[in-house]
C-alpha cells in the first residue's frame, strides 16, 4: 500500500486517509493505491462502510497532481482500477462510502467526494471544478454527477468558471449531508457510519443497486424493473434471514443481529 494512504479498520468501518502534503493531490501511483483500497473494501465481507478523508486541515484533495502533469503525466493516463482517485468509476460498489471533507475539495478532489454516497464536511471546506481554467474538463465524474445535484445555471457557472462553493452553500443545495466544525468532522463521519452499520447490509446493497438501475427511469417503469427479477440483491432481501430478523427484533424490543443473508 502507498505511504500516501493510511488505512484504519474500526470493526466493520474502514477509514482511508489521503496524506500527500501539501495539498493531498493525486497522481497515477496514488490513484492506483486508492483503487486497490476501495476494491479490497468492496470485496471484504467483514467491512460495511468506508470513510475517505484527507490529512491535515486545509485540503481534502486538490485533485490531479499538476506537478505530475507538468512532468508528463497525461490527463488520460491510466489511473488504475476504479478510475481517478480509485472510486470515481467503481460502479458495482454496494457498500456506502462517506467523504469526510476536511478542507478544499477541488477538481478531482471534488469528484472523489461526489462519488461517495454521503458528504460530511468541515465549516472551512469549499468545493470547485476549475478544470476549464487549466484547459481540461472534469471528466472523472464532475461533469456527470454534479448536474444530478444542482440546477443547470449553477452547474454551468461552476464548471465553466471554476467558481467555488462554500460548505454552507453546498448544504443549502443538498450537495453535502452535514457541516460541522473541523474538530467534530471525524466524530460526525463515524457517527453516520455507525448508523449505516445498524442497518441491514443486504438492504443497503439492494438500495444502492436499485438507485443505479432506476435513477433515469419513470417511476412506473422503475416498479416493473425492480420486480422483473433481473436485480441481484432486491430478490435476495425479500427472502433473507435478515428480513425475518428485523421484524422479530422489533417485536422483541431488541437490536437486530444482521447476518447479511
From Swiss-Prot:
Keyword Ribosomal protein: no
Gene Ontology terms for molecular function: hydro-lyase activity; L-carnitine CoA-transferase activity
Catalytic reaction annotation: (R)-carnitinyl-CoA = crotonobetainyl-CoA + H2O
CDD domains in the record: crotonase-like
Function: Catalyzes the reversible dehydration of L-carnitinyl-CoA to crotonobetainyl-CoA.
Native source species: Salmonella typhimurium (strain LT2 / SGSC1412 / ATCC 700720)
Family: Belongs to the enoyl-CoA hydratase/isomerase family.
One BP annotation, GO: fatty acid beta-oxidation
Pathway assignment: Amine and polyamine metabolism; carnitine metabolism
Disulphide bond pairs: none
EC number: 4.2.1.149
Full protein name: Carnitinyl-CoA dehydratase
Pfam family, one: ECH_1
Keyword Glycoprotein set for record: no
InterPro entries on file: Carnitinyl_CoA_dehydratase, ClpP/crotonase-like_dom_sf, Enoyl-CoA_hyd/isom_CS, Enoyl-CoA_hydra/iso, Enoyl-CoA_hydra_C
Catalytic residues, chain numbering: 111, 131
Keyword field: Lyase
Amino acid at each position: 500500500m502507498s505511504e500516501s494512504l493510511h488505512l484504519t479498520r474500526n470493526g466493520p468501518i474502514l477509514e482511508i486517509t489521503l496524506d500527500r502534503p501539501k495539498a493531498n493531490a493525486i497522481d497515477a501511483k496514488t490513484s492506483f493505491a486508492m483503487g486497490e483500497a476501495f476494491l479490497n473494501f468492496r470485496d471484504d465481507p467483514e467491512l460495511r462502510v468506508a470513510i475517505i478523508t484527507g490529512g491535515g486541515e486545509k485540503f481534502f484533495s486538490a485533485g490531479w497532481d499538476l506537478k505530475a502533469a507538468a512532468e508528463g503525466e497525461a490527463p488520460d493516463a491510466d489511473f488504475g482500477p476504479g478510475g481517478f482517485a480509485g472510486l470515481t468509476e467503481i460502479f458495482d460498489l454496494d457498500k456506502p462510502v462517506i467523504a469526510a471533507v476536511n478542507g478544499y475539495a477541488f477538481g478531482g478532489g471534488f469528484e472523489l467526494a461526489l462519488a461517495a454516497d454521503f458528504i460530511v464536511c468541515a465549516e472551512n471546506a469549499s468545493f470547485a471544478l476549475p478544470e476549464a481554467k487549466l484547459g481540461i474538463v472534469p471528466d472523472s465524474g464532475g461533469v456527470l454527477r454534479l448536474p444530478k445535484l444542482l440546477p443547470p445555471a449553477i452547474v454551468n457557472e461552476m464548471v465553466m468558471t471554476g467558481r467555488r462553493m462554500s460548505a454552507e452553500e453546498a448544504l443549502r443545495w443538498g450537495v453535502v449531508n452535514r457541516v460541522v466544525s473541523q474538530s467534530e468532522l471525524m466524530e460526525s463521519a463515524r457517527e453516520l457510519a455507525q448508523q449505516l452499520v445498524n442497518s441491514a447490509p443486504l438492504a443497503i446493497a439492494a438500495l444502492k443497486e436499485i438507485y443505479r438501475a432506476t435513477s433515469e427511469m419513470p417511476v412506473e417503469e422503475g416498479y416493473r424493473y425492480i420486480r422483473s427479477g433481473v436485480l441481484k440483491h432486491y430478490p435476495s432481501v425479500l427472502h433473507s434471514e435478515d428480513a425475518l430478523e428485523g421484524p422479530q427484533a422489533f417485536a422483541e424490543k431488541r437490536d437486530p443481529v444482521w447476518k447479511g443473508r
